[in-house]
Protein backbone atom coordinates (compact mmCIF):
# COMPACT_ATOMS: atom_id res chain seq x y z
CA UNK A 1 0.00 0.00 0.00
CA UNK A 2 1.32 3.41 -0.98
CA UNK A 3 1.75 5.85 1.89
CA UNK A 4 2.52 9.57 2.02
CA UNK A 5 4.39 11.29 4.83
CA UNK A 6 4.53 15.05 5.17
CA UNK A 7 7.76 16.79 6.15
CA UNK A 8 7.65 20.52 6.90
CA UNK A 9 10.73 22.48 5.87
CA UNK A 10 11.21 25.31 8.35
CA UNK A 11 15.01 25.31 8.42
CA UNK A 12 17.88 23.49 6.76
CA UNK A 13 17.90 21.07 9.69
CA UNK A 14 14.34 20.03 8.74
CA UNK A 15 15.79 17.94 5.91
CA UNK A 16 17.25 15.58 8.50
CA UNK A 17 13.69 14.48 9.29
CA UNK A 18 13.68 12.68 5.94
CA UNK A 19 15.91 10.01 7.51
CA UNK A 20 12.93 8.94 9.63
CA UNK A 21 10.44 9.07 6.74
CA UNK A 22 12.47 7.37 3.99
CA UNK A 23 13.75 3.75 4.18
CA UNK A 24 17.46 3.72 5.03
CA UNK A 25 18.50 1.99 1.79
CA UNK A 26 17.13 4.95 -0.20
CA UNK A 27 18.74 7.87 1.56
CA UNK A 28 22.16 8.95 2.81
CA UNK A 29 23.86 12.16 3.87
CA UNK A 30 24.72 12.95 0.25
CA UNK A 31 20.98 13.22 -0.48
CA UNK A 32 20.38 15.38 2.59
CA UNK A 33 23.24 17.76 1.74
CA UNK A 34 22.16 18.11 -1.89
CA UNK A 35 18.61 18.97 -0.86
CA UNK A 36 19.89 21.50 1.65
CA UNK A 37 22.23 23.08 -0.92
CA UNK A 38 19.93 23.16 -3.94
CA UNK A 39 16.43 23.47 -2.46
CA UNK A 40 17.26 25.11 0.84
CA UNK A 41 14.32 27.17 2.08
CA UNK A 42 12.80 27.62 -1.37
CA UNK A 43 10.26 24.92 -0.51
CA UNK A 44 8.23 24.56 2.67
CA UNK A 45 6.98 20.98 2.38
CA UNK A 46 8.11 17.58 1.12
CA UNK A 47 5.68 14.70 0.76
CA UNK A 48 7.37 11.31 0.81
CA UNK A 49 5.67 8.67 -1.40
CA UNK A 50 6.61 5.05 -0.69
CA UNK A 51 6.77 2.57 -2.28
CA UNK A 52 7.25 3.83 -5.81
CA UNK A 53 8.04 1.57 -8.77
CA UNK A 54 10.30 3.60 -11.03
CA UNK A 55 10.45 2.34 -14.61
CA UNK A 56 13.97 3.67 -15.14
CA UNK A 57 15.43 2.07 -12.04
CA UNK A 58 13.62 -1.22 -12.73
CA UNK A 59 15.01 -1.23 -16.28
CA UNK A 60 18.53 -1.31 -14.80
CA UNK A 61 17.58 -3.60 -11.93
CA UNK A 62 16.56 -6.48 -14.21
CA UNK A 63 19.60 -6.31 -16.49
CA UNK A 64 22.22 -5.49 -13.86
CA UNK A 65 21.43 -5.14 -10.15
CA UNK A 66 19.48 -8.40 -9.89
CA UNK A 67 22.61 -10.25 -11.05
CA UNK A 68 24.92 -8.84 -8.39
CA UNK A 69 26.09 -10.81 -5.37
CA UNK A 70 24.90 -8.09 -3.01
CA UNK A 71 21.08 -7.93 -2.96
CA UNK A 72 19.43 -4.76 -4.23
CA UNK A 73 15.80 -3.87 -3.67
CA UNK A 74 13.23 -2.97 -6.32
CA UNK A 75 11.37 -0.27 -4.44
CA UNK A 76 12.06 3.44 -4.76
CA UNK A 77 10.38 6.47 -3.24
CA UNK A 78 9.47 9.92 -4.50
CA UNK A 79 9.92 13.25 -2.78
CA UNK A 80 7.20 15.65 -3.91
CA UNK A 81 8.30 19.26 -3.52
CA UNK A 82 5.81 21.98 -2.59
CA UNK A 83 5.78 25.62 -1.55
CA UNK A 84 2.62 27.29 -0.29
CA UNK A 85 0.67 24.28 -1.62
CA UNK A 86 2.03 24.81 -5.15
CA UNK A 87 3.55 21.71 -6.75
CA UNK A 88 7.14 22.08 -8.00
CA UNK A 89 7.93 18.51 -9.07
CA UNK A 90 9.51 15.39 -7.63
CA UNK A 91 12.80 13.63 -6.94
CA UNK A 92 13.11 9.83 -7.09
CA UNK A 93 15.33 8.05 -4.57
CA UNK A 94 16.63 4.59 -5.51
CA UNK A 95 18.47 1.83 -3.55
CA UNK A 96 21.81 2.22 -5.33
CA UNK A 97 25.32 2.89 -4.01
CA UNK A 98 26.00 5.80 -1.64
CA UNK A 99 26.30 9.06 -3.54
CA UNK A 100 24.14 7.82 -6.44
CA UNK A 101 20.71 7.53 -4.83
CA UNK A 102 19.05 10.50 -6.56
CA UNK A 103 17.32 9.11 -9.62
CA UNK A 104 14.77 10.45 -12.10
CA UNK A 105 13.98 14.06 -11.23
CA UNK A 106 11.59 16.64 -12.63
CA UNK A 107 11.69 20.04 -10.91
CA UNK A 108 10.35 23.41 -12.00
CA UNK A 109 13.49 25.48 -12.71
CA UNK A 110 12.17 28.52 -10.81
CA UNK A 111 12.80 26.46 -7.69
CA UNK A 112 16.53 26.24 -8.43
CA UNK A 113 17.60 29.39 -10.28
CA UNK A 114 17.01 33.10 -9.86
CA UNK A 115 18.87 34.66 -12.79
CA UNK A 116 17.52 34.92 -16.34
CA UNK A 117 18.21 31.83 -18.43
CA UNK A 118 17.22 30.14 -21.68
CA UNK A 119 15.99 26.64 -20.89
CA UNK A 120 14.59 23.70 -22.84
CA UNK A 121 11.39 22.77 -21.02
CA UNK A 122 8.39 20.52 -21.52
CA UNK A 123 5.27 19.71 -19.51
CA UNK A 124 5.81 16.34 -17.83
CA UNK A 125 3.10 14.55 -15.86
CA UNK A 126 3.15 13.16 -12.34
CA UNK A 127 0.31 11.28 -10.66
CA UNK A 128 0.07 12.16 -6.98
CA UNK A 129 -2.71 10.69 -4.81
CA UNK A 130 -4.92 10.22 -7.85
CA UNK A 131 -4.28 13.72 -9.18
CA UNK A 132 -2.42 14.42 -12.41
CA UNK A 133 0.14 17.17 -11.88
CA UNK A 134 2.00 19.08 -14.59
CA UNK A 135 5.69 19.92 -14.21
CA UNK A 136 7.33 22.28 -16.69
CA UNK A 137 10.84 20.91 -16.51
CA UNK A 138 13.85 19.27 -18.13
CA UNK A 139 14.60 15.66 -17.09
CA UNK A 140 17.57 15.02 -14.82
CA UNK A 141 19.08 12.11 -12.92
CA UNK A 142 22.43 11.43 -11.26
CA UNK A 143 24.68 8.85 -12.86
CA UNK A 144 25.38 5.48 -11.32
CA UNK A 145 28.78 3.92 -10.86
CA UNK A 146 28.79 0.96 -13.21
CA UNK A 147 25.73 0.83 -15.49
CA UNK A 148 24.37 4.27 -16.36
CA UNK A 149 27.47 6.42 -16.26
CA UNK A 150 27.88 9.96 -17.57
CA UNK A 151 27.26 9.38 -21.29
CA UNK A 152 24.30 7.04 -20.71
CA UNK A 153 22.70 9.60 -18.41
CA UNK A 154 23.24 12.44 -20.89
CA UNK A 155 21.65 10.34 -23.65
CA UNK A 156 18.73 9.58 -21.32
CA UNK A 157 18.01 13.27 -20.71
CA UNK A 158 18.03 13.91 -24.46
CA UNK A 159 15.74 11.02 -25.40
CA UNK A 160 13.40 11.67 -22.46
CA UNK A 161 13.01 15.34 -23.38
CA UNK A 162 12.69 15.00 -27.15
CA UNK A 163 10.73 11.73 -26.96
CA UNK A 164 8.05 13.39 -24.85
CA UNK A 165 7.94 16.72 -26.67
CA UNK A 166 8.15 15.65 -30.31
CA UNK A 167 6.49 12.72 -32.05
CA UNK A 168 9.45 12.15 -34.38
CA UNK A 169 11.69 10.98 -31.54
CA UNK A 170 11.50 7.89 -29.35
CA UNK A 171 11.60 7.91 -25.55
CA UNK A 172 13.65 5.28 -23.71
CA UNK A 173 14.42 4.05 -20.23
CA UNK A 174 18.02 4.09 -19.07
CA UNK A 175 18.10 0.28 -19.23
CA UNK A 176 16.99 0.32 -22.88
CA UNK A 177 19.76 2.77 -23.70
CA UNK A 178 22.32 0.49 -22.06
CA UNK A 179 20.99 -2.52 -23.98
CA UNK A 180 21.06 -0.64 -27.30
CA UNK A 181 24.64 0.55 -26.88
CA UNK A 182 26.97 -1.01 -29.45
CA UNK A 183 30.01 -2.62 -27.88
CA UNK A 184 32.08 -4.92 -30.05
CA UNK A 185 35.10 -5.00 -27.74
CA UNK A 186 33.66 -5.90 -24.35
CA UNK A 187 30.69 -6.19 -22.06
CA UNK A 188 28.03 -3.51 -21.68
CA UNK A 189 27.96 -3.63 -17.88
CA UNK A 190 29.78 -2.70 -15.78
CA UNK A 191 30.60 0.28 -18.00
CA UNK A 192 33.46 2.75 -17.75
CA UNK A 193 31.82 5.13 -20.22
CA UNK A 194 31.08 5.53 -23.92
CA UNK A 195 33.06 6.84 -26.88
CA UNK A 196 31.67 9.63 -29.11
CA UNK A 197 31.00 7.03 -31.82
CA UNK A 198 29.02 4.86 -29.39
CA UNK A 199 26.93 7.84 -28.28
CA UNK A 200 26.31 8.80 -31.91
CA UNK A 201 25.25 5.26 -32.86
CA UNK A 202 23.03 5.05 -29.79
CA UNK A 203 21.17 8.28 -30.57
CA UNK A 204 20.65 7.16 -34.17
CA UNK A 205 18.48 4.35 -32.80
CA UNK A 206 16.09 7.02 -31.52
CA UNK A 207 15.80 9.04 -34.76
CA UNK A 208 18.53 11.59 -34.00
CA UNK A 209 21.13 12.61 -36.57
CA UNK A 210 24.29 13.29 -34.55
CA UNK A 211 27.33 15.06 -35.98
CA UNK A 212 30.74 14.27 -34.48
Task: Identify the residue ranges that each predicted region occupies.
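Non-catalytic propeptide/linker segments at domain boundaries
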Residues: 75-136
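Weak global preference for isoleucine
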Residues: 2, 7-9, 27, 32, ...
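Conserved active-site-adjacent core of cysteine acyl-enzyme catalytic domains
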Residues: 1-69, 178-212
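Proteins with a high burden of low-complexity, intrinsically disordered sequence enriched in S/T/G/P/A and R
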Residues: 84, 98-101, 161-163, 208, ...
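Context-gated lysine
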Residues: 5, 10, 19, 33, ...
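Active-site nucleophile-adjacent alpha helix/oxyanion-hole segment immediately C-terminal to the catalytic cysteine
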Residues: 117-187
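Intrinsically disordered, low-complexity regions
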Residues: 41, 74, 90, 100, ...
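Proline-rich intrinsically disordered, low-complexity coils
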Residues: 23, 51, 71, 95-98, ...
Amino acid sequence: MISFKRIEIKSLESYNNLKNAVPSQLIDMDVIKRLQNYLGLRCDEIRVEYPYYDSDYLSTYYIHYSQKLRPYGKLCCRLHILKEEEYYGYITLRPTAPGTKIGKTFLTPELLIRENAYLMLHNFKAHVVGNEMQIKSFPWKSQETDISVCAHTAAWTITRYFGNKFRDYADATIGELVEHTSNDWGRKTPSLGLTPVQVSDLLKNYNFSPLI
